[in-house]
Design a protein with these regions (language model features):
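Conserved C-terminal portion of the radical SAM core fold
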Residues: 1-63, 119, 123, 127
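Flexible glycine/acidic-rich beta-alpha junction loops that bind and position SAM and/or redox cofactors
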Residues: 22-30, 46-99
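Alpha-helix boundary/capping residues
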Residues: 39-42, 72-73, 106-107
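Radical SAM enzyme core and accessory elements
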Residues: 64-67, 77-173
Length: 173
């Protein structure tokens, strides 16, 4: 249904934007890679199909996933003050993979998450964008092509050690 909606809106030159989440408890690496593949498939539909930067799952109270996160060792803030100070405030309210126990020591999942949440959106840049941003988007697309190639090689070889491209992204930012 999502693909169909994307095709219809693109054919009618209506911008559609889709959002995704990754890093849920019990999510397999295969599921994460399927998400990557689906996002790429959507983006190929046309220039009016866009995706937001993929978000890493953030455990919030009040649901089964939150309870499962706590059971898996998530060190949840215990009161409102803790939700607004400390480690969550340091990272702008967004949880880093190292704060989620089911991701903390899994280099493969951490690399996939880093790729999906940081690099996958870099290839945006549509012909209808302003000319002011064209040059910067050209540079971003070139960097994206290199980093995307690196990710493809990692995926093919199933090699997830030495995450140098993550450090490169931090420098580029």
């Amino acid at each position: 249904q999502v693909e169909h909606a994307a095709k219809i809106t693109n054919d009618n030159k209506i911008v559609s934007e889709f959002s995704f989440m990754i890093g849920l408890p019990q999510e397999s690496i295969e599921d994460m890679l399927k998400t990557v593949d689906f996002i790429k498939k959507l983006k190929k539909i046309g220039e009016y199909v866009m995706t937001q930067n993929v978000q890493l799952y953030r455990p919030y109270p009040g649901g089964e996933l939150y309870n499962e996160s706590v059971r898996l060792g998530f060190d949840a803030p215990r009161n409102i003050r803790e939700w607004t100070t400390g480690k969550l405030l340091e990272i702008g309210g967004f949880v880093k993979p190292e704060y989620l126990p089911w991701l903390r020591n899994d280099n493969k999942k951490a690399m996939v998450i880093r790729y999906v949440t940081t690099l996958l959106f870099w290839d945006s840049g549509r012909k209808w964008e302003s000319k002011v941003t064209f040059w910067w988007n050209w540079v971003r697309r070139a960097a994206y092509a290199i980093l995307n190639g690196t990710f493809a090689i990692r995926r093919k070889l199933d090699f997830w050690a030495l995450p140098v491209e993550c450090q490169a992204v931090d420098i580029i930012r």
